[in-house]
Amino acid sequence: MNKSTLAVAVAFGVLAQQAGAAGFIEDSKASLSSRTMYFNNDNRDGGADQREAAQGFKFDYLSGFTQGTVGFGLDVQAISGIHLDGGRGHHPDNNSFNPSDSDGSATQSWSRIAGNVKARLSKTEAHLGGALQPSLPILVANDSRLLPQTFEGGTITSKEIDNVTFNAGQLEHAVGRASSNSTGLAVAGGTQDSNQFRYAGADWKVTKDLTLQYYHSNLQDYYKQNFFGLVHVFPIDTNQSFKTDIRYFDSSSDGKNGDAGYRFNNNGGYAKTPGEVDNKTWSAMFTYTLGGNAFLLGHQRVNDDGGFVYLNQGNVVDGNGRPEGAGGASFYLFTDSMINGFVRAGENTTFGQYSYDFAGLGVPGLKASIAYLHGDNIKATNGTGSDMSEWERDMRIDYTVQQGTLKGFGVTLRNGVYRGSQINIADQDQTRLIFNYTYSFL
């Protein structure tokens, strides 16, 4: 039994004695979510293609808080995945969709259970456990496959000051979206894990239309990072608006970074000091909304010294030197797209998207979008070769049933095409078909 599971069991025993307290039960929520997913990745340049289908279930119980100056509560999450289709030839080992057995074939099923104990004092909440899913500029939990990525540690959120939300925490382990095992934390290329990711920051809503953000984070022995953000929405009319969203990251090396086992692969691109973190990246997006139409245009620049860095446990190995299978990560840049990230040294990316909400045409719940990204000026890994380029086109259609017995049932179809010039990533065509449904008990 790991530490987080033990903590949840102890907490449940203590809180069960107060289960009758107003709020703990009355404010509880429980739901069961189902996700069926078909994943098809066609490597156009050769190599093993991936074609798999799987069924996932996720049960969430979120209690209220007990009475008193300090209220206590408990959250529990149980998830399970079942492999439906895709033989060994269509299941690349160490992928982030379905875990692998020792012979490289897909595991038929996997599951995990974890939870968080929580406390509330005034407008401040603390959560401690192994089912944390942060969504912050310096860390975004990934939920783009069958089951969600989760983290183990502690977080604090405070809204004691009007219009300001403070966030702080320390995380020690992660569980990948295609794994039931927890690992330490690392970056792309790092095989040795770190058990300390600390962060603190705030979102300040200066006016109802303007929000400023600052966050600092540190992954011990890998990197330190500062983030600055600005979000402004200009309401033009009742059904028109113009949104500005600007993000800036400044990242540098920490501790053992650069040593054997702690090297950052700089996303497969150039690095002024190989293995070390040294990066500044800014990204800006502008969105004009008119009724159900949304037109997005943006630009992003990664400096020449190294690639953009973020938490990524894809290369962490176990005691036998075998990958833990904890790959798959998200990051807080607009270029975190369906297939690629556009975050190598020197890369300049221009991107645009058009989306439409069909509610205005009498079809509520139906949405569609198409996006295109083009990155160039990517520095060659040796720093002296010709600059490289890449592009990606993503399309998406979503429909959610609005009423009746199947209210909330959703279908998503996504298709992405990626092509690169002299890039060490294979050209890919990718399709995902996803069915989602959540039933709420409470």
How would you label these PLM feature ranges?
Residues 68-71, 123-127, 163-167, 175, ...:
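Repeated loop/turn-to-beta-strand initiation elements of outer-membrane beta-barrel proteins
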Residues 49-55, 109-113, 148-152, 194-198, ...:
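Residues that define the transmembrane beta-barrel architecture of outer-membrane proteins
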Residues 59, 115, 154, 166, ...:
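Membrane-embedded beta-strands of outer-membrane beta-barrel proteins
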Residues 297-385, 393-395:
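C-terminal structural cap/anchor segments
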Residues 34-38, 126-141, 166-172, 200, ...:
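Transmembrane beta-strand segments that form the barrel wall of outer-membrane beta-barrel proteins
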Residues 89-108, 125-204, 213, 218-220, ...:
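Surface-exposed coil loops of outer-membrane beta-barrel proteins
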Residues 3-133, 355-359, 371, 387-404, ...:
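Beta-barrel outer-membrane channel/assembly domains of diderm bacteria
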Residues 82-84, 167-187, 239-335, 413-433:
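Outer-membrane beta-barrel translocator/channel fold
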